Amino acid sequence: MMNVRNLILLSCVSSYAFAAVADGKPYSVPVDADYPKSVYWGDTHLHTRNSADAYSLGNMNLSPADAFRFAQGQELIAHNGMRVQLRRPLDFLVVSDHAEYLGGYYRFNVGDSLVTETSAGKQWQGYLEEGDPVKLIAAFTASMSDPENNYPFPEKVRRLIWEDVAITADEHNKPGRFTAFTGYEWTSMIEGNNLHRVVVYKDGADKTTQLPPFSGQDSLDPRELWKALARYEEATGGEVMAIAHNGNISNGMMFPSVSVDGKKINRAYAELRARWEPIYEVSQVKGDGEAHPTLSPDDEFADFETWDADNIGRTAVKEDWMLKHEY
């Protein structure tokens, strides 16, 4: 069923012919047109209770299955008790929960031994016994900023949780009507600087479950993420890509002149990035990443939803030199 998926998020706006053409001759689209001619609406970046941040901020109930149902137009009860429903259903959805401690906080709080018996689960229990739940979100932050100082889940736990994620997407995929993509977010945050990528699979659970997600606990270097995506395609014959976002809170690290280890960016690096990151998320609640008034002073729309005070961790203020490496 899943092999009919297309990466419809890459579709572009159709070309339309108007009746009144300059030479008065009839017009029709060539049958061999090699570009997309349909527009699809969806969301490539959405978190559920499986994400540590969403769970900590109040979404303790809504699951990936709920998200897929909501995207298709079904009414849900939100975490605040309100009834919610889209006026128009979406064509596709990527549930892209954070790979770091994926599903962990929810499973921990409902007493799932799959998580409570892990090193991370025991650490979290200690925080609660101390009466300091704030340390729970701090543990999540550490997982995406310091791989040497966190407690990743064992491989078996990661695989079991990931299988549930992938199977849920399959169950809600309806070829020709609604596309449910399997995905996750790789959440690298070096010194408070945002390097996040959403990873999107074209495949179904028969392939996506063969390898667990590559997280910030594995590496904070984007090149290691790209290698992981290459390993996935080589091992499964499937297709996968990444979508970077929010360069505006990366403090110059999203489109750098040097890699995270200080080496100068070269053509090979650029081509590798283009191979695995063919598109970019330009706007979301944490600011717009398409243009900045300093870089485009003559563009009256360049100041749309500008968020440029600091980085995502709020550990350092923005400096002017950073801007050209963020948009």
Region roles according to the model:
Residues 20-327:
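Extended, charged catalytic domains and RNA/DNA-binding interfaces, predominantly
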Residues 1-19:
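Gram-negative bacterial Sec-dependent N-terminal signal peptides
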